[in-house]
């Protein structure tokens, strides 16, 4: 099947055939079929809801994705019902759809899924809650900072940083000593973006690392925070550093702070 075939099906009103195309072996065809179905809007919602019961998981994934793109509130309850009944790989798509529809009633459901036994489900729930920005999610996301999976901890940091809650600098700063370099970098970046000066000391501690991403993100964050207290530590890190990329980040941070002091 080609893209043109999908468009012909849509033009002829053969919407069920379009739904069956969600099972195509080619990922780009499946994705294009989702896009066409989503563009058709409310008139295909009943067919897409029925497709949530399809025997092929790829069809169920595509149907959920299309429903999320359409944003129909009518799809909320069918999606919620299917969430706990389907396999984790499909449940991910259902969570994404619920979040895109954006009704506040789904927040407790997403919060519950942050404690799911399946890693993909936890990851998707944490990411979706960050996109929604509902403060009810904060205690659940804090719990996910101690998740066994690096990628869930990383996403929890990013989601919490979107909540615009100044006090969250404290639990996020604890991740600066995480075993994962990616998580440490995400925590440093989040602290810089949050702008809370109370995070300065924790970020200074990260300058003692030899890991490139630690130094890069710590320098960038400290530059954003413009703390004079960090200057001596940034300069000391520069003296012992030889990597060009890190030197540039340290120089930029020093310049940001010194320029701010002069103004």
Where are these regions (language model features)?
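Alpha-helical adaptor scaffolds
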Residues: 150, 154, 158, 166-173, ...
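Conserved hydrophobic register position within alpha-solenoid helical repeats
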Residues: 2-5, 33, 63, 94, ...
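Short inter-helical turns and helix N-cap capping residues of alpha-solenoid HEAT/ARM repeat scaffolds
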Residues: 25-26, 55-56, 86-87, 117-118, ...
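TPR/Sel1-like alpha-solenoid repeat signature
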Residues: 37, 51, 63, 67, ...
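Amphipathic alpha-helical scaffolding segments comprising HEAT/armadillo-like alpha-solenoid repeats
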Residues: 10-22, 42-53, 72-84, 103-115, ...
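Core register positions within helices of long alpha-helical scaffolds
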Residues: 5-8, 36-39, 66-69, 97, ...
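Alpha-helical segment of the N-proximal tetratricopeptide repeat
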Residues: 2-9, 17-39
